[in-house]
Each structure stands twice: as C-alpha cells, then as structure tokens.
Swiss-Prot record:
The active site is at C133. It comes from Pseudomonas aeruginosa (strain ATCC 15692 / DSM 22644 / CIP 104116 / JCM 14847 / LMG 12228 / 1C / PRS 101 / PAO1). This is Beta-ketodecanoyl-[acyl-carrier-protein] synthase. The keyword Metal-binding does not apply. CDD domains: KAS_III. Belongs to the thiolase-like superfamily. Beta-ketoacyl-ACP synthases family. Catalyzes the condensation of octanoyl-CoA, obtained from exogenously supplied fatty acids via beta-oxidation, with malonyl-[acyl-carrier protein], forming 3-oxodecanoyl-[acyl-carrier protein], an intermediate of the fatty acid elongation cycle that can then be extended to supply all of the cellular fatty acid needs. The enzyme thereby shunts fatty acid degradation intermediates from the beta-oxidation pathway into de novo fatty acid biosynthesis.
Length: 350
C-alpha cells in the first residue's frame, strides 16, 4: 500500500499542472480501511516483494531461468506436490498423470505439467489447463473422470499461482487483490487410498458463461499489434461491481441445484470451502444458500491472510479447515471466476 501511495503522490506531483487545468484526474491514495472493507484482505504472500515495493517498478522481480533449470512454476508445483504425496501416503510411482491447473502459465510449451512430471519422476502423462480461478475444481473434475474411466489409478492435480505477475499494482481498485500460492490435490481410486485425510468425491458440477467483466488480454499475438503493448488490459482487469452482481446468484444457484441433484439438503452441509476472492461475495453466497448468515466455521476464510490466490484459494481453505470434521461429514468445495467459470465439488469425509 505504501508503494502504491508513493506512486500516487509522485504521479500527482508530476502532473500537477494538467490536474489543475482539469486535463487529468488526480489519483487517489489507498488505505487499509478501504482494502479491508472492499475485500476482507489484510495480508498476503508474494514470490518477490522487493520489485513490488519499489515505486519506480511495482512489478515482482523474477529472473528468467535457463532451460536447464526447472521453471519457477515447476518449482512451486513440485514443493506442493511432495507435501500432498506425503499426506496421501503415496510416491511418484503411484501417480499416473499430472494436471497443472492455474490462471496463468509462464510459457506456451512444453507444458508445465510435463516438466513437473519429469521433476518428480512420474510415469504416464501430463497436461496444463486454465479456467482462471476455477482451475482447481475443473482440474479435480478432470482427474475424477480419468479415475472413473480407468485411465489412471491416481492423478496429481496442482495449482501454481503467481498472481502478482499479472496484477496491476498501480490500479487502486485491484492493487491489493492477489497473492501467490500453490496447492496440490491427489485424486485416486477409493479402493487404493491409504491416507488418513481422505474425502470421497460424491459429485462434481461445472458451469461456464462468457463474460468480458474479468479479462486478461496478454497473449502471443500482442506483438502483432504494437499499439496495444503495455496497455492495462494486458494485465488483470475487471468490472468488480458487475462481477459481484452476476456471479453471486450464479454460484448459489449452481451449488443449490448440485446438492439437490444428489439428494442432499443445504442444512446437511457442514462446510463450504469457497473461492477466496472477496469476503462480501462469500457472505452473500452462503446467505443465499443457508437463508441466514453463515457461522465462521461453516464457511472458513483464509483470504484475510493470503489474499486472492486464484484457483489455490478454496483448496487452501479446505486444507486448513478439515481436521475437525467427523467421518461422513458433507462439504462443498466451490470456485468461481473469469469466464465466467464456476465449479462445485461435493465431498464426504471418509
């Protein structure tokens, strides 16, 4: 926040004459009160803070690596994967496929998933997928299908999110939104599972509906039109109020219908692990579902500490808020974001 406010003061000083003439609008400073009221975010973790905190730069500094080194996304994914493997009581030999599902990939090819596969010594196959903030739930659904069809015994689904790489730190409405994180999930045949931390996947449901209200236009064709290079739409941009108005009822409706299709009453759900983008969105979604305000334990919040970590957020919430649930307890893992994209995964504690 201090680097943003320093940038604002420098900008206003440099353009004081134009601002005085009404040719430019003065930029407004940010504040902790504004950020917490708008989002519920109080802190975050980032891969590199020095570059972000430099008012002259305000971009993380992540040096390019040689092709002989593992990429930074691979490095993150491997660290999370090893923790997930240990928690599941599995080794690389037990995994038949790798899905890297995240909101931004650092290169077109070779796939980060294939690199992760090599780094961990996993046989089989790997591929990348991007459904923005819903990448994890869509990845779980893809992994579930692979298990159900006999294509694999177990799938490693991992979400390396360096969200600060596509965040405009000079935009007051979004400079605080994202943090960096990586999560990993192992989906495997129930009859082979040995972990003490198991959940049965009862059902999955996905929905997409096209919208321009959340966009990132960065891509390989940008260089074909130099006039667009460096414009703000090449980073994360959104119409926040429109997103709030559109997405909240869509998520509540999808989860409600998904539960009903599986003959589960909303009141039977012990926990909602929702996408961690905005506290106000989650409060409204659970209020629509429950018909009342959710208790803190019913819809745990981690975005106050981690900020929006895109696809990783709901999985972090699941990881940190599951151990107290008894066997047989029902929970819903749900994500929502750009696309629009919404994923719902009904889980039962083993």
């Amino acid at each position: 926040m201090e680097s943003f406010n320093t940038f604002v003061r420098q900008y206003n000083d440099q353009h004081a004459e134009a601002i005085a003439k009404g040719e430019l609008e003065a930029l407004a400073e940010s504040s902790s009160a504004f950020i917490e009221k708008a989002s519920g975010i109080k802190s975050r973790f980032v891969m590199n803070k020095e570059g972000i905190l430099d008012p002259q730069r305000m971009v993380p500094y992540l040096p390019e690596r040689s092709n002989d080194e593992w990429s930074i996304l691979c490095e993150m994914a491997v660290a999370a994967a090893r923790e997930a493997l240990q928690r599941a009581g599995r080794s690389a030999a037990d995994i038949d496929g790798v899905i890297v599902a995240c909101s931004n990939l650092q290169r077109a090819y070779p796939a980060i998933a294939v690199e992760v596969q090599a780094a961990l010594g996993i046989q089989g196959y790997g591929y990348d997928m991007n459904v923005a903030c819903s990448s994890a739930t869509f990845g779980i659904q893809a992994a579930t299908t692979a298990i159900q069809t006999g294509q694999a015994r177990a799938i490693l689904m991992v979400n390396p999110e360096i969200c600060t790489g596509h965040l405009n730190f000079r935009d007051r409405d979004s400079h605080f939104i994202f943090g960096d994180a990586c999560t990993a999930v192992i989906v495997e045949r129930a009859d082979l599972a040995v972990s003490k931390h198991q959940f049965d996947i009862v059902s999955t449901r996905l929905l997409t509906q096209f919208s321009n209200n959340i966009r990132n236009n960065f891509g390989f064709l940008n260089r074909a039109d130099e006039s667009g290079i460096g414009k703000r739409d090449k980073l994360f941009v959104q119409e926040g109020r429109k997103v709030f108005k559109d997405v909240c009822p869509m998520v509540a409706e999808l989860i409600g219908e998904h539960l009903a299709a599986n003959e589960i009453q909303v009141a039977e759900v012990k926990r909602f692990w929702l996408h961690q983008a905005n506290l106000n969105m989650n409060l409204l979604i659970t209020r629509k579902l429950l018909g009342r305000d959710a208790e803190a334990h019913e819809a745990p919040v981690i975005l106050d500490s981690y900020a929006n970590t895109s696809s990783a957020g709901s999985v972090i919430a699941l990881h940190k808020h599951q151990d107290d649930l008894p066997s047989g307890a029902i929970g819903v893992l749900s994500s929502f974001g750009a696309g629009y994209s919404i994923g719902s995964v009904i889980l039962r504690k083993h």
